[in-house]
Amino acid sequence: MGMLVEGRWTDETPDPAIGRFNRPESRFRSRITADGFSGFTAEPGRYHLYVSYGCPWAHRTIIFRALKGLEGMVSMSIALPDDRRDGWRFGTGFPGATADAVNGFTWMHQAYSAADPHYTGKVTVPTLWDKATRSIVNNESSEIIRMFNSGFDAMGANPGDYYPPHLAAEIDRINEVVYAGLNNGVYRTGFAGTQDAYDEAVGRVFACLDMLEQRLAGQRYLVGDTLTEADWRLFVTLVRFDAVYHHAFKCMLRPLSSYHHLDNYLRDLHQVPGVAATVRLDHIVTSYYSSERVNPNGIVPILPALDFSRPHDRDRFARASSFSRAA
């Protein structure tokens, strides 16, 4: 996939750095706040979310939009999962994908050029757009989910705090571990350019999975009995693991289904009201296997059935009674 250079779309120049995958930092880092002190006030109908069902980083924001009941406050455009040689594209040529009803953009990079005509860098989803100023608020998923978590509470968002202050330090700690070992670790494995880089990365992936399996043997969620942001950040990788990362990214030591506690935990989260509708395996599989870098011949495999609606055994653990799940 290419990038923008001084506001113009161009083919990407590969990074030859010792065969290891390096994820660039997000560039737009403003925040929406209830008081508008940041320059962006929380207002129903003002903001628009550009996403892909295939992308795990975008999936985080789709989940939080659903959990917090923001569908009527933050509109959303869903990119096509296939043929991303010129970046993320919008249209109705794939079930569940949409046109851009706000700006009429065909390509995601058009939003970046509109926000900054001299922008140089990657064009990514999720991207949170401000209709009032015609600018990008933020394209960092970890920050967008925090805005969705609490920024619209005064406007009637669903109850529930996925980043409670008394658990923030532990959530941050486990987030760092899961990001390095798994969220980004599967990409470091799949895009490794040398055997040494691959061996190092895949070892970290399964060390992280082993640690999480042990942790979840004695508690319902990553941070005890409370469902938090950390669980949703892990969920988006787990739900893709057997469908794409196990084969396409060469994480083949063990399938996720062989981890008893993680497999049940995944189904527990998938069955939280509102979450199943955010998981589109057709988009996920097409998105990864249509990538020339991952799968040069572009053949999209037919998967065995992955049934996340099967019963799980996680109800044997306590769940914090003060937390209200989305209805």
Predicted segment positions?
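C-terminal alpha-helical interaction module
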Residues: 1-327
